[in-house]
Amino acid sequence: MALNILNPGLSTSIQDLGRPGYFHLGIPIGGAMDRFAMRVANMLVGNAEEAAGLEAVFMGPEITFTEDALIAITGAELPVMLDGVEQNTWTALTVTKGQTLSFGFLQSGARIYIAVSGGIDTPVALGSRSTYPIGALGGVDGRNVAAGDMLPVGKAGKAMAGASIAPAHRRMPSNPAILRMVKGLYWHRLTEASGQQFLNDEWKVAPEADRMGYRFRGGKPLEFVDREQPFGAGSDPSNIVDGCYSYGSIQVPGGTEPIVLHRDAVSGGGYFTLGAIISADMDYIGQLQPHTPVKFEAVSMDEALAARKERHNLLDQIRASLA
């Protein structure tokens, strides 16, 4: 069986849960920007949660199916159609051979996830099928999908059409979106007033936000404590001697526009990081559209761990409901 890509939409790529273990070599973890949505889509069609599916940004692709299949659409909300007939999202849908899957205009969120029973079965690169175009890894010969591609699908597992996920289990962006963060090693570089101003300000997602990082604009420039820059750090107070970046780190080049480093981000560099977004909110960031208002909220490590546990418990509930 294969998926025939008639129209790839704006930007559609093959993604799974990523390729951890190579960050020390400068290869990003990659994978779905909204891992929760990717996991749930796979659960609905009977796949392993790490199976590969499609991630579409802002606009869905147009696809025909060479055989009968079970599919699920999760993530952003938008009209989903099979041969022009609207279907439910977050639901296991039966597709018959020759039918065409298409999408309407985005209503909320930013990224759409498409899982098919059996999972997309393209070659594995460093333990993952996830597309990383800069490194030409995964995907279709290292690139996003294009019109005319025939994406192979693996052997289908067991699942029932009609299974669905309740709206209460779906987290969509609020206004403003609240991004919880833990202050980092370089927070002390800010003046006390500037650190508080950063948290008080309302920022907006910049149009440049992508898989490498989400940039934000609109807040006041940061002010730094006067100090002598260490040798090799450069003259700008936002510079450091090169250090490692964790997933979710918040760097602020020049002290003006925060960037949250996401799935395809670099593993290190010479900008200070004032903290990191908690893991429970990283999927949420992947669903923020440009110009969405955002506020950063500082939380403790215990609060961050509690939020992560809450997300894990939610996934356990969904697994149990679909078992």
Name what the model sees in each region.
Residues 1-323:
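Conserved "landmark" site that anchors the functional core of diverse proteins
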